Structures are given as C-alpha cells and as structure tokens.
C-alpha cells in the first residue's frame, strides 16, 4: 500500500460563533512610547484580543511553519463554522499559501457578538471536514493513476484540528460521536464512488480554548482510539500566548520537527551603532538534522536544553566565525528547510535577511572540552533557507576503517569473499508461495528469514587466520549443507564422504592451510594441525546437531572417525620421530656448532659445581678434631687436558677460557703428587722402600697408574 500519512491532509475547523468574540483577557501594551513622552498626554490603554483572533493567529502560525518546511505534499483545508460551514480553500496546490487564507479570512471577518448562538454550532464544520477528507488530492490521484487496477492500495488518512469553546466534557464526547458517525456514513458513500476515497484513519484534535483567569470546564485527555478509524485527543488551553504555544508544540509533533537555537548572533544596536549585542534565534526543521547529535552523545557535547512551557527540547548551536578555508569544510550530509519560531522579531528578521542576501553562517557545537566542532551551516538556495548538516566525523565518502584493531595492528584478513557469498545466500526477497508451520498456522516469511540467518551464523569465523576448515576446499560439501534446516539422505552421504576424505588426508599426512601469521618458527606440527581441524569441524557440526536425526548421523560419523585405533597412534608416533629427524637434518652446520659449544660449556659448569661441593665438604671434615688430615689431592683431569694448551689461531672460545682458568686455579691449590713428579710415561712404581729394606730380588711389586 502506498502510504499517505495523516500529515498529508490537515483540516482546520475554527469556531465562528458569537461566544468566540469574547475577550481572552490577556492584555497587550499598545502604547510602547515610554521615553520622550510629552507632558500632559495620557497613554493609550492596553488592549486584549478576542478568542477568535487568538485562534486564527495560532492556526495561521501552524500553517506558516508547515508551509515553510513542507511546501509540497502537505496540504491544509481551512473551514469556518457558525450557522453553516464555509471552506476557505481547496486541496489544490495553488491554494496552499498564507496569502489565500488571509484574504479569505479578511472577507469573513470576526464573529458577530449579536448573532443568535442557538443557530450556530461547530458541528457544521466537523461534518464538512469529514467530507473534505473523503475528497481526492492531486497527489493521491496521481498515485491511483499509476497503480491503475490496484488503485485501492493508495491510503487515505487525515487529521482534523478543531478550535472551539466547549461547554463540558459531555459536549466534547458528543462532538467525537458525531465525527465517528459521519466518517462511517461517508465511507459508505465513498465505497460506490470513483471521485471519493474511504477514510482509513482519522486523527481528531479537539482544542478547548477559554479566557485567561477562568476555570476550564473541559479536562485534558491523551490519545484514545474511539473506533478502528477514529483516534481522538482533547486539549484544554488558555487563550493568548498559551494557545500559540500549544499549536507550536502540535506542529512539531505532527510533522516530526525539532528545534535549534542559534546563540551569540552579533547584531548592531539601533541606539548605539558602534556597539553590538548577542541575540538568540530559534528555528524549526525536520528532526533528521539532529541525527549526528546522537553520535556525539557522551563526547563532551553540552548543547541540549529544555524551553519554558514546551514539551520539546531545543539544541543550542553557536554562531561561528571560522578562520579556515571553505575547502577545508566537511562534506554536507543533508539539507533541511527551516522556519523561525518568532518570525516577526528583529533578530529573526535580521538573520533571515542576512542569509537571503547570499551569506552563509557556520554553526558549532558548544562543548565542555575539546576542540571546536562545526556541525551545521545555514545558507539559502533559490530564496529558501536551508540548515545544512556537516559531517563532523569521518566522511561517508571515504573508505570505512578497519573493523577492529588489535595489539598487532589492524586486522586485514577478513573473509570478505566468503561474507559476500554469505550475504547472497541470506538476501531478502518477495516470497509468493505461502508456507505453514508445524502447528498449521501460516509461516511469516520474515521470521523464516531470521531463523535461516541464525542457523548460518551459529559458527562463522570472521577472520581467515581464525579458521582452518573454511579455508579447505575439501570441507565445502559438508559446510554448505550442514546449515540446512533438514538434511536429505544424499546430503548425509555427502557429509560422510567429506569426513572420510579428511581421514584419508590425515593418513597420507597431507598439509593443511594453517595460518602462521604472527607466530615464530614453523608453526604447529602436522598431527597438531589435524587435531585443530577436527576440533573446529566438531564445533561446526555440533552447532547444528539439534536440527534433525540426520544431523546426528553426521555427528556420529565424525566422532567415530576421530577415535583412532592403537596401530594408528603407533604410526603417528613414528611419523613424529621422523619429522624430528628431518628437522634436525635441516638445521645449518653453524647452528649445530653453536649447540655443541653450549653443551660443552654446560658440562664445564657442572664440573665446577661438583668441585665447590667437594671443597666445602673437605673443609668441614678438616675442622673436626677427630678426623685425620686428608692428603692433598688434585682433581681428576683427563690426560689430554693436562698437556700444554695449543695456541689458538683465532679468538679464544668460551670453553678454552674456562679450561685455562680451571687449570690455573687447580695448580695453585694443591702440591703435586710425588709419584707423578718422578714417574716415567705417567707410571710410578709403588712400595720401593720395601725392596730396599728386605733386599729381595726378583720380587715384583704391584704397580698402579693414576691419571
């Protein structure tokens, strides 16, 4: 259905009965010449407006704001009701301007206070308003012509704003019942006519206005649905400026408007031409101009305030005089027509004239801290003033930033191609054939699309380095069908074949596409790679196992293939040993040389530690009174180590330095063994004194060698 909102048609019904000529009792100072008054002249008495004048001024202000911001497609029909109903204009676009309405109102004139009140009623105007809503506007006729046989798809909605002086709540209820009955009667007439349209929805706004100082006989009531066609609300408002404020609030609610107050506007004073003062001007515009402020919430922005006696908040922007080139301005993301709230005030007229002369005004956000942020600009185009929204953050024309930024830098390996395929599989489209749920009720296509999206995103890694199976072409047959709501027998067989192929790949020890980004070395070993792959595949299948029994069969097949027999584990161990040997063989000779030197230095360090322990133990034994004095001994050293050290042809290694230091320290600690000093070829003869004492010949004493 082509939607025409309730704001497309607005019918004003203003009471023109005699009681509307009563004074509103809100005085206005007529004589404002308080200075330089000649002596003896009596000032003019203050005046007060009638209820009729207050109602017309407030309704005209409503229409002015609407025409300023929405010059097209928002229409007003003005009706005056007394002894009958008189329509001041039509739905034609040519009649939609304030000049036509003001000229028609001038012809009608104020209500006659001497007229018979019994002959006057607001009901005449309400009935005429319902008839007017049934008439087709040019925009509705254009839409009906485009749709041809589907012309009934064009909606007809409208709003009736009635300003009157009601007697009581029961009188208001009678007016609502009259409107409700009239709508049903005219809908029956419109059903059989090609020139009328049935009313699908009508919003009735009843405004009871009364003089200032009197008690209201009518109570306020929020929106209430009286029927499937009529919604009504009641406002009880004092006349004068209170009525104007109420209509100002309603026009913002009815047309989704927002308020912006321009502060610190420099203006020359009339009395003092050389000085200037700062003024404020409040503007109304569409609320989309404040979308950027939602993004700025919590970033130091401090420009929202509530106006007195107003439901809506206003956003404060400061007049800005930047020292930057216009080329440095951000891109404009939107332009919205504006309308001053107090159009006749001197600051408003000065600002509008300044803009209509071709000038532009930059506006900045008042912030508690931080740098200046220019968020809006006022400028005129073709005699109309627009509020331009400037992008205060990243330009919408630039490439978006990286989704996340980790400790290693921006993430760049997103699965962009896979995500494009994912969007293609989950795009929304019209669904012609109706489907039914298990309980027999109709299945909503939107809910079905949400369920499919939920299934596809149960396990979907976003980064290439975080997944293994989605980088393997061999897993595609399983990953593409496991997300289905129900599997066929052929799907189950394809999934099982995929699992068997993976088992065969593991048996052949085929490499896997494991990402080594951000890791040092060669990455995980082959069996560890397959363990990661099987774990991820199990996570994917387990996320969808509750779908059906066939999903469970795929899961059972996967778990059965993961449990390996003992001979398979033994083969894996042999494979790991072979890989270790291959890695050692692949090491360069320089690396092996460094390892040997390191092992030798470790051996020397362990020898030194043992020496220290022996020395400490010897000191303890020596200090005890009962222990004999131990002989001085030299630690066991290899024979080849005792030889003279060859001079190195190059720089000495760490091992040579340690060996030289150890030999020097040992030579200083102990006296050399007498037998070693007198030995021949490092062999000493023992017990020589026994031969000399006994004089025995040919007796060979025991010999020992000590190294």
Swiss-Prot record:
Its cellular-component GO annotations read: cytoplasm; INTAC complex; nucleus
Q: Which GO terms describe its biological process?
A: cell division; flagellated sperm motility; regulation of fertilization; regulation of mitotic cell cycle; RNA polymerase II transcription initiation surveillance
What are the protein's UniProt keywords? Cell cycle, Cell division, Coiled coil, Cytoplasm, Developmental protein, Mitosis, Nucleus
Q: Which InterPro entries match?
A: Cell_cycle_regulator_Mat89Bb
Q: Which residues form a coiled coil?
A: 567-622
PANTHER family in the record? INTEGRATOR COMPLEX SUBUNIT 13, SARCOMA ANTIGEN NY-SAR-95-RELATED
Q: What's the domain remark here? A: The cleavage module binding motif (CMBM) mediates recruitment of transcription factors.
UniProt-recorded name of the protein: Integrator complex subunit 13
GN (gene name): ints13
